[in-house]
Amino acid sequence: MTSPRKTHPLAKIINESFIDLPTPSNISSWWNFGSLLGICLIIQITTGLFLAMHYTPDTSTAFSSVAHITRDVNYGWMIRYMHANGASMFFVCLFLHIGRGLYYGSFLFLKTWNIGIILLLTTMATAFMGYVLPWGQMSFWGATVITNLLSAIPYIGSDLVQWXWGGFSVDKATLTRFFTFHFILPFIIAALATIHLLFLHETGSSNPSGMMSDPDKVMFHPYYTTKDILGLIFLLLSLMSLTLFMPDLLTDPDNYTLANPLNTPPHIKPEWYFLFAYAILRSIPNKLGGVLALVLSILILMVIPVLHFSKQQSMMFRPITQILFWALVADLLTLTWIGGQPVEYPFVTIGQTASIMYFFIIITLMPLFALIENKLFKW
């Protein structure tokens, strides 16, 4: 008799996605991060749900409600810090997942890649709106500065900003709508992640060699479920170490001060995972130019498949492009560092150089060296 997991309409979907899924036998731990992102999303939705039970999205009580969660709610401090640091772990996994996709040529699965970029943008929007909710100084001024960027759009810009704010400044209406969107977006992310998986299972996973792996596949369970559990242990260990020993390591001290529209903090900066994009935004003196560069720094991922001229999918056997890839990683780390520094010499110059290098490596150097490598392989 056939097992119910192979015949039952619901169990069959789970079986084909996580149990009997044919998977290349040579995929490394870099393929772990997809499942870890799923776990991160579950952690964020669960902790967020418990926080929403006690939080009040009102300018007069939001800050004190967060203090109440931290002090009076049973394990409220832990739920809050798990949620805040869980966002950081989410972005660590997200960046490593994208990096793996770039290195091993997974971007050639166009549908999966493009849904992934939409997922990245949605996650960034969710994280930004979540950062506004505690209603501290950095929450308020971060919201003011970033939403104000819409005013750079010609003709309709200022109307668009007021429409988003729900008034003439960031106030009660803004906080309420940000809470609403922050609550609903993770469920949209979960739906998009399902579509992401659906498209991935149409083509099957790539593998480190970049070669076709159809003749050499194994079942996902038990081989990769056990392998993923190891990654999960490291993820939970990192998250709980951060939460229990250094909960405020990645947060801004200014956010422990109640939002005050009359007092601007000396350095307005977003959370660490947005600093690279913030550095690109600041490196262009023109407002519209900065906003365009900011948007393009993410959307450039969409043109990477078009700029792939190499005859090989993966970078595994392409040493010159490997050097460029790690130069790009170093460049992004430099931008992240610069984004957290004040706007003064020499940080401005370093930021501008790193911003130019970011686009130059992706648009010019990588396609150029792919063509050179194609020539070298013919010899």
Swiss-Prot record:
Its main location: mitochondrion. Keywords: Electron transport, Heme, Iron, Membrane, Metal-binding, Mitochondrion, Mitochondrion inner membrane, Respiratory chain, Transmembrane, Transmembrane helix, Transport, Ubiquinone. The keyword Iron applies. Its cofactor is heme b. SUPFAM superfamilies: a domain/subunit of cytochrome bc1 complex (Ubiquinol-cytochrome c reductase) (SSF81648), Transmembrane di-heme cytochromes (SSF81342). It is found in: Mitochondrion inner membrane. The chain crosses the membrane at residues 33-53, 77-98, 113-133, 178-198, 226-246, 288-308, 320-340, 347-367. It comes from the Eukaryota. GO terms for molecular function: metal ion binding; ubiquinol-cytochrome-c reductase activity. A ubiquinone binds at residue 201. Heme b b566 binds at residues 97, 196. GO terms for biological process: mitochondrial electron transport, ubiquinol to cytochrome c. The keyword Phosphoprotein does not apply. Heme b b562 binds at residues 83, 182. GO terms for cellular component: mitochondrial inner membrane; respiratory chain complex III. Changing residue 78 to T: In strain: Isolate 02. Component of the ubiquinol-cytochrome c reductase complex (complex III or cytochrome b-c1 complex) that is part of the mitochondrial respiratory chain. The b-c1 complex mediates electron transfer from ubiquinol to cytochrome c. Contributes to the generation of a proton gradient across the mitochondrial membrane that is then used for ATP synthesis. Belongs to the cytochrome b family. Heme 1 (or BL or b562) is low-potential and absorbs at about 562 nm, and heme 2 (or BH or b566) is high-potential and absorbs at about 566 nm. This is Cytochrome b. It comes from Aotus azarai subsp. infulatus (Feline night monkey).
